[in-house]
């Protein structure tokens, strides 16, 4: 019986691991999309290319806990930490959606060390477009 080979390293043989290059972007934009079910924070460069992102689900919350302000706070801190590795120091904030994590996410971006410039609400308003979902009866 031949001897067993030692376990291979975590990287597969012949496969290159892609190295993420560090961009140097001092000023960016933070897009906070806060829905009733989740909060997504994306930090972009001035052209709109995403540098860092995080969401309540990505941070580790599941189900109804994703929609809490605390989950939005952790998602914003996580995205801010990743963006600071790319040199982001100042952001303009664009908030979209009706969710509960809007204000908390903005506050935690400031607390994480990013300087917040302008804050704009870019929630899309329908000109009587799609029919909204029916009322819940609990």
From Swiss-Prot:
Residue ranges, compositional bias (Basic residues): 13-22
Tagged with keyword Iron: no
Listed Low complexity bias regions: 1-12
GO cellular component, one term: ribosome
InterPro entries, A to Z: Ribosomal_uS11, Ribosomal_uS11_bac-type, Ribosomal_uS11_CS, Ribosomal_uS11_sf
Keywords in alphabetical order: Ribonucleoprotein, Ribosomal protein, RNA-binding, rRNA-binding
GO biological process: translation
Keyword Electron transport: no
Residue ranges crossing the lipid bilayer per the database entry: none
Superkingdom: Bacteria
GO molecular function: rRNA binding; structural constituent of ribosome
PANTHER family assigned: 40S RIBOSOMAL PROTEIN S14/30S RIBOSOMAL PROTEIN S11 (PTHR11759)
Family the entry assigns: Belongs to the universal ribosomal protein uS11 family.
Primary role: Located on the platform of the 30S subunit, it bridges several disparate RNA helices of the 16S rRNA. Forms part of the Shine-Dalgarno cleft in the 70S ribosome.
NCBIfam families: PRK05309.1, uS11_bact
HAMAP family: Ribosomal_uS11 (MF_01310)
Assembly and binders: Part of the 30S ribosomal subunit. Interacts with proteins S7 and S18. Binds to IF-3.
Protein known as: Small ribosomal subunit protein uS11
Naturally occurring in which organism (per UniProt): Mycobacterium sp. (strain KMS)
